[in-house]
């Protein structure tokens, strides 16, 4: 166990909140400072907020700069996990170079139409995402995944997914991009590691997960309370869970409002309350 984990092991928390970023805590304004402040607000009420994103280690480090209480974070859809004071992040699965080599092999054997971040210029990436030049550069610094812009049919995407599965890779769909990573990796992997770290026999925290897309499903499934945010088309990703809350829209204000409602409503939360399905929508 590293120094940072030893330092935090004694800290008991009632709530562990795992949250996706784009389309959940962040909206099109991409206000990292406000997102950090929203997570800090919950921390002041006894919650540890753990961001879990397709973003890179460098991008997540930038978010932590705006937090008074930096937390662990899960990056690249679960291909990595970083503790606040750890000298190096943990990496899981194949690295990006190996993934790209395998993608080149797939491209040579099939006629799939897509472009990875290695084929998209920084300028085009800025235009697609609205990121600054420095943020776009950070988004390309991948260690365990490769995002791509799918330019083929949904049927071709299914065939692509099958071809990847055969060689131990997977494609996950986020908001704007798909991402290819090792089949063993997902946000739930990082969530499980963080949750185990904070679990104590006398004080087991309640797990809350927030997300809006298919790449959040494993993380949502592990939670005691799942919070769904609408995708860009206004629809909620299909998902079954004993306790589901539906947020009206994304962005730090709505995220914080929803979380405040949940923390108040579920103050007396216990295991027996999971015996029924609950649906709550917050406007």
Model-based region annotation:
Residues 7-12, 32, 178-283:
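Mg2+-dependent phosphoryl-transfer enzymes with acidic/Ser/Thr/Gly-rich catalytic loops
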Residues 13-29, 220:
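Asp-based phosphoryl-transfer active-site loop
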Residues 14-17, 71, 207:
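The start of beta-strands in P-loop NTPase/AAA+ ATPase cores
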Residues 27-45, 158, 185-197:
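Short, acidic loop-to-helix structural element flanking the phosphoryl-transfer center
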Residues 28-119:
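Active-site phosphate-binding/coordination module
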Residues 67-69, 76-77, 167, 222-224, ...:
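Short, structured coil segments at secondary-structure junctions
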Residues 70-76, 134-135, 226-231:
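Short hydrophobic/aromatic-enriched beta-strand-loop microsegments
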Residues 106-208, 214-215:
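Conserved acidic, metal-coordinating active-site core of Asp-based
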């Amino acid at each position: 166990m590293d120094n940072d984990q030893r330092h935090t092991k004694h800290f008991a928390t009632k709530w562990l909140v795992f949250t996706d970023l784009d389309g959940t805590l962040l909206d099109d304004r991409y206000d990292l400072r406000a997102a950090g402040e929203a997570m800090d607000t919950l921390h002041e009420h006894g919650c540890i907020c753990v961001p879990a994103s397709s973003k890179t280690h460098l991008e997540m480090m930038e978010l932590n700069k705006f937090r008074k209480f930096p937390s662990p974070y899960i990056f690249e859809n679960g291909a990595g996990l970083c503790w606040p004071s750890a000298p190096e992040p943990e990496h899981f699965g194949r690295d990006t170079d190996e993934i790209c080599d395998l993608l080149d092999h797939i491209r040579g054997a099939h006629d799939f139409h897509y472009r990875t971040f290695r084929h998209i210029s920084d300028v085009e990436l800025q235009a697609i995402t609205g990121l600054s030049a420095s943020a776009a550069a950070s988004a390309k610094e991948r260690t365990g995944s490769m995002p791509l812009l799918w330019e083929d049919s949904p049927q071709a995407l299914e065939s692509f997914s099958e071809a990847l599965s055969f060689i131990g890779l997977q494609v996950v769909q986020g908001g704007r991009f798909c991402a290819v990573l090792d089949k063993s990796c997902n946000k739930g992997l990082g969530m499980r590691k963080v949750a185990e770290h904070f679990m104590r026999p006398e004080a087991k925290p309640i797990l809350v997960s927030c997300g809006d897309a298919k790449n959040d499903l494993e993380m949502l499934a592990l939670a005691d309370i799942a919070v769904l945010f609408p995708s860009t088309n206004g629809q909620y990703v299909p998902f079954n869970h004993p306790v589901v809350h539906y947020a009206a829209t994304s962005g730090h204000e709505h995220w914080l409002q929803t979380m405040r409602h949940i923390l108040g409503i579920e103050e007396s939360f216990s295991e027996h309350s999971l015996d029924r399905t609950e649906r709550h929508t917050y406007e």
